[in-house]
Amino acid sequence: MITLYNTLTRQKETFEPIEPGKVKMYVCGPTVYNYIHIGNARPAINYDVVRRYFEYKGYEVIYVSNFTDVDDKLINRSKELNESVPDIADRYIKAFYEDVGALNVKKATSNPRVMNHMDEIIDFIKELVDEGYAYESDGDVYFRTRKFEGYGKLSHQSLDDLKVGARIEAGEQKEDALDFTLWKKAKPGEISWESPFGEGRPGWHIECSVMAFHELGKTIDIHAGGSDLQFPHHENEIAQSEAHNHAPFANYWMHNGFINIDNEKMSKSLGNFILVHDIIKEVDPDVLRFFMISVHYRSPINYNLELVNAAKSGLERIRNSYQLIEERETIATDIVDQSKYIEQIDAIIEQFETVMDDDFNTANAVTAWYDLSKLANKYVLENNTSTQVISRFKEVYQIFSDVLGVPLKGNKSDMLLDEDIEKLIEERNEARKNKDFARADEIRDMLKEQNIILEDTPQGVRFKRG
């Protein structure tokens, strides 16, 4: 039985799907005007794990995540680069697939694009106008926020609270400062579409409502995204969707925590804006994913190299223990009864499922993986060789790998072979003889980065993999 924290009710609830055996998920995707940053990568990874766990439990998951390919940021980028909005969007959508693919994020069931749903968006807005939930004003269309009685229920704010910070910008012809834009009047030189309200383009919030409705129907099981989207984006989605559909928009709302960089908020002005496209050239994508899931999805993450290196070491311990089990398989027999180990392994998988059932607690799931790794090391050190036990170890390692999305083996092309290490040790010895200590230290540090430890022995320098 899976429970999850529902932002709408601010409590954990037992998950009950609309349709037995099926989960309909909508996850807000990126605005494709640039490469995604690690703040975008977090929900991609977190909700990929949620999807994987539902699938592990036997559910069919319809996973929809959109691309915002019409937006102020894209229009500004278009002017800056002197390229068309569609061309820029196409380029960064391709880059998105490459980046999240490197992070082992499964491809969504569907990735709808705003431009492909323009007719549906216009019809949706027209129906809101016809029902009195929206109004036209000098080429723009606004949603009548006060007409929707439940406004503020997701962010747990009253209309009076919201009114305090609301204002009408220059050029806006709103009835109320709380009203938000559904359709923007075209400006000279900007991409636009014909509509009954005049030429223009959709507002940000309406895009997700329409794509979710088109892909998943009136009511979806889970709507997810970053905490920064809770208000106003998700609040506005609820208002316009429920006004249009006359039904609850989503039964469960999930929001992941923020990412800080060295204890500071990530921002371009601070110069700590990290793009996935860049960081995966320096940090193994498997390590980055493992780092992300080592923290509960609702908790904030502090990104720094020390913590990433700790995640790297942790993942290497797991992989090394799995390699030992694989090597033991070649000499496995069924001579001795070792059912006690089967019981211990089964207790760990039960522990894993218990914590994942509790709001997808990947931090504790990783702890269960470490426990499995320790047990595997103990098993090998005792020179045990039961085929049954080794098979069960491998099976559970694979379950953890599949659910958490972290491969059991790294990219072999990135690993130094033994003969390469021996050559580097010889080169280091030669450098020390020649008093080239800078080169000797450089080789030592390079090997250390590969988690290879050098040891001085009476027989000479030896190495071991950490």
Swiss-Prot record:
* Motif 'HIGH' region: chain residues: 30-40
Q: Which InterPro entries match?
A: Cys-tRNA-ligase, Cys-tRNA-synt_Ia_DALR, Cys-tRNA/MSH_ligase, CysS_C, Rossmann-like_a/b/a_fold, tRNA-synt_1_cat_dom, tRNAsynth_Ia_anticodon-bd
Would you indicate the residue range of the signal peptide? none
Pfam families (alphabetical) = CysS_C (PF23493), DALR_2 (PF09190), tRNA-synt_1e (PF01406)
The record's annotation in SMART domains points to: DALR_2 (SM00840)
- Can you tell which superkingdom this protein's organism belongs to? Bacteria
Entry note: cofactor:
Binds 1 zinc ion per subunit.
Top-down, what is the taxonomic lineage of the species of origin?
Bacteria, Bacillati, Bacillota, Bacilli, Bacillales
Name the catalysed reactions. Answer: tRNA(Cys) + L-cysteine + ATP = L-cysteinyl-tRNA(Cys) + AMP + diphosphate
What is a single cellular component term in the Gene Ontology annotation? cytosol
| Alphabetized GO MF terms | ATP binding; cysteine-tRNA ligase activity; zinc ion binding
Q: Where is this motif: 'KMSKS' region?
A: 265-269
Which residues take part in binding Zn(2+)? C28, C208, H233, E237
Transmembrane stretches, by residue range? none
Q: Which GO terms describe its biological process?
A: cysteinyl-tRNA aminoacylation
Ligase listed as a keyword:
yes
Instruction: Provide the E.C. number(s) assigned to this enzyme.
Output: 6.1.1.16
Q: Spell out the family assignment given in the record's similarity comment.
A: Belongs to the class-I aminoacyl-tRNA synthetase family.
* Record localization: Cytoplasm
Provide the binding site for ATP.
K268
The entry's keywords: Aminoacyl-tRNA synthetase, ATP-binding, Cytoplasm, Ligase, Metal-binding, Nucleotide-binding, Protein biosynthesis, Zinc
* PANTHER family xrefs: CYSTEINE--TRNA LIGASE, CYTOPLASMIC, CYSTEINYL-TRNA SYNTHETASE
The protein's name in its UniProt record:
Cysteine--tRNA ligase
Describe its assembly.
Monomer.
Annotated gene: cysS
Name its co-factor(s): Zn(2+)
> Main subcellular localization, coarse class?
cytoplasm
Asked if Zinc is a keyword of the record, the answer is: yes
